[in-house]
């Protein structure tokens, strides 16, 4: 995360995580954060409307209340309203990403981003999880699954600074480089 963005998001993320801990809502808040991040990423209309300076703060808060009042904890809804009041709701995704980073840091959870050519079924996810746990040297691991059809087949795993590239596109590229050296 960029330093300026980190300066904006960290106080909100730290404070909200502290509130969640005080109310014994951490697991619930983490799950809700992941769901909201997914919605934020999938619905550009929603995220753009919330970030728009044209839409009044009170209107944004009313929309947030209507959409989320039954879906998230009251403290989470208060965070959303606070971000709207402070004209920071456009940074919601960054605040939630930072909250998840802090959560993982506190619990020593490593994040592994797995990018595959197609969606992985549960058996494939479990197999990749075992492999990544042995490579990362920890059982405390969270998988972030992404799909990129450009990989053609296989997968790429990023854990911290380690990369496991078992994609077909990478193998084709390496084969092409090897053939270029031979000729």
UniProtKB/Swiss-Prot annotation:
InterPro entries: ATP_synth_OSCP/delta_N_sf, ATPase_OSCP/d_CS, ATPase_OSCP/dsu. GO terms for molecular function: proton-transporting ATP synthase activity, rotational mechanism. PROSITE patterns: ATPASE_DELTA. GO terms for cellular component: plasma membrane-derived thylakoid membrane; proton-transporting ATP synthase complex. Keywords: ATP synthesis, CF(1), Hydrogen ion transport, Ion transport, Membrane, Thylakoid, Transport. It is a peripheral membrane protein. SUPFAM superfamilies: N-terminal domain of the delta subunit of the F1F0-ATP synthase. Its main location: membrane. It is found in: Cellular thylakoid membrane. Gene3D superfamilies: N-terminal domain of the delta subunit of the F1F0-ATP synthase. PANTHER family: ATP SYNTHASE DELTA CHAIN. F-type ATPases have 2 components, F(1) - the catalytic core - and F(0) - the membrane proton channel. F(1) has five subunits: alpha(3), beta(3), gamma(1), delta(1), epsilon(1). CF(0) has four main subunits: a(1), b(1), b'(1) and c(10-14). The alpha and beta chains form an alternating ring which encloses part of the gamma chain. F(1) is attached to F(0) by a central stalk formed by the gamma and epsilon chains, while a peripheral stalk is formed by the delta, b and b' chains. Belongs to the ATPase delta chain family. F(1)F(0) ATP synthase produces ATP from ADP in the presence of a proton or sodium gradient. F-type ATPases consist of two structural domains, F(1) containing the extramembraneous catalytic core and F(0) containing the membrane proton channel, linked together by a central stalk and a peripheral stalk. During catalysis, ATP synthesis in the catalytic domain of F(1) is coupled via a rotary mechanism of the central stalk subunits to proton translocation. This protein is part of the stalk that links CF(0) to CF(1). It either transmits conformational changes from CF(0) to CF(1) or is implicated in proton conduction. This is ATP synthase subunit delta. It comes from Prochlorococcus marinus (strain SARG / CCMP1375 / SS120). The gene is atpH.
